[in-house]
Amino acid sequence: AETFKINGKAAVIGNAVELKDGEVLSFTADIETDGDYIIGIEYTPLNALYMDCLMNLAVDGGEKIVSLPLLWADAASEYGTDRMGNQIVPEQLAVSEYYTDWLHDYGDTDKNILILPLKTGVHSISLTSESQSLKVTKIYIKKYREPVSYAEYSAQLPKNTVSETYTLEAEEYSVKSDSFIRAASRKNAALY
């Protein structure tokens, strides 16, 4: 069984462990083969702010600022209107269910998934929450695989035999990756 520590004291990730703002969650990872790896976490925010959860990641002494995205939902699906008939944006709520995502490189302009080159052997890893508290249930360390191109992916699928066109409605989202995302109507022929 893996040993986890919070601020140097033993911690068990059974149902969940609370990682409060400023606390350090540390563990070791035994890597079997040299290569590029990514770290995933199953988590839920405890005191969500209107931004991603920033964390300090230390691997064998080297440090990096990483982020975990938070998911958001509208408190009400029906938008009220003000006296001028304009829609009023409902209260934003952080999704309270557990979800899994990979650590993102906060210093990268595109905030891509953080890829760590690791050698065979045991590595000391620690995560320090810098902006908000989380409940963590699982931590994954997985060998990174370069995504295949769409052409390669579609070549593996059976040929399209669908003769109908389907239209998907996308205004009523269930969750969103940013609390400021809003559905909006644009009257622009170029968008059709």
Where are the model-predicted features located?
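Extracytoplasmic
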Residues: 1-192
